[in-house]
Amino acid sequence: MTSASPSRSTAWLRVVTLAIAAFIFNTTEFIPVGLLSDIANSFAMKTEDVGLMITIYAWIVAVASLICMLLTSGIERRKLLIGLFSLFILSHLLSAVAWNFTVLVISRAGVALAHSVFWSITASLAIRMAPPGKRAQALGLIATGSSLAMVLGLPLGRVIGQYLGWRVTFLTIAAGATVAMILLARLLPLLPSEHSGSLGSVPKLFRRPALVGIYLLTVVVVTAHFTAYSYIEPFIQTVAGLPENFTTLILLLFGCAGIAGSMLYSRYSDRFPIGFLVTAMLLLLACLTLLMPLSGYPFGLTLLCLVWGLAMMSIGLAMQAKVLSLAPDASDVAMSIFSGLFNLGIGGGALLGSQVSLHLGMDKIGYVGAPLVLVALFATLLSVYRSVRLVHSRV
């Protein structure tokens, strides 16, 4: 912490700065979702093959999160964030001039390395800088920054790519990241590393059954979500037969719903933690199951995507908060594992969606994702049942 306690307005301004950084990182992580067709056309490739770029990015993050976090555990956090943004900006400049798909993937690998550390430390930094008693609201604000990436970043990036080319989209992200880096340098205080944990923390964390359960749940649910979401752009255009502008609208509404989900989380998660998570998982299950049946009805598909975005944001926030509560003594290590596993799910879902699209048809992506949510939901309810029985047996 800083030597003097900041005012509430200063504390919130610092959290907002982190939320802006989250907006930038989340925009670039998912921007390929809105540009798959354009990138595929540029390199004369199949959309399903270009989609593997999402898998490669996510799996680099999955592998690098813990390793990079441990390697940087002793670095002062403001300096670390500026270094991460420098790598981030240079990688996007390379993306903008990529002369073939291999170079584009290499440039995305640089972004993924920056990502792997950023999301390992951001949640704990937000909590650390939040005003007293406002931890959930600080996390909600970071989530809002992430959601705004879906509301503004992803649709805007798609529009820029549609009219000016996908390379200009990456240049625009690099410019935005430069502004964010300047804000971080000017507004954040010195942030010595605290409670980051060490390599010795890892086996201790994996001896906590509840934490391991959250980790497994994360992989399964995120895989289910990204089996369908990774290919929502070509799904809307080829399966639903709707125009490109409708795809942009859907991506916009999905992000808006994510903001609503973060607000609901801030308001209700403390009072109804289990009910909140189970309800969100039920909604996700319904959305994936109904994706194909509602694809022929634009209004129904729009409503489905609203509920889908709300549910997924709620699930992600609930699991992230649970990880932090179960590992307060090694929050950065715990979050790096969470980030890695989250991205393992992203990569697994994108790969599964690609294979489903190639071999079964893109219209099946929702049907393949839904059973995974059902498995996660059953495991959650079973865990709750066992916990209740254990409490009653001790009474």
UniProtKB/Swiss-Prot annotation:
Q: What does the UniProt keyword field contain? A: Cell inner membrane, Cell membrane, Membrane, Sugar transport, Transmembrane, Transmembrane helix, Transport
Superkingdom of origin organism: Bacteria
> TM segments?
15-35, 50-70, 81-101, 103-123, 136-156, 170-190, 209-229, 246-266, 272-292, 299-319, 333-353, 365-385
Matching Pfam families: MFS_1 (PF07690)
Q: Mention one GO molecular function.
A: carbohydrate transmembrane transporter activity
Q: What induces it?
A: Activated by glucose, and to a lesser extent by other metabolizable sugars such as galacturonate, arabinose and melibiose. Repressed by cyclic AMP receptor protein (CRP).
Cross-referenced InterPro entries: MFS, MFS_dom, MFS_Efflux_Transporters, MFS_trans_sf, Sugar_effux_transptr_put
| Topology class, membrane | Multi-pass membrane protein
Q: Name one GO cellular component term.
A: plasma membrane
Q: Give compartment(s).
A: Cell inner membrane
Q: Which family does the record assign?
A: Belongs to the major facilitator superfamily. SotB (TC 2.A.1.2) family.
Q: What does this protein do?
A: Involved in the efflux of sugars. The physiological role may be the reduction of the intracellular concentration of toxic sugars or sugar metabolites. Transports IPTG, lactose and melibiose.
What HAMAP family does the entry give? MFS_SotB
Q: What is this protein called?
A: Sugar efflux transporter B
Instruction: Identify the coding gene.
Output: sotB
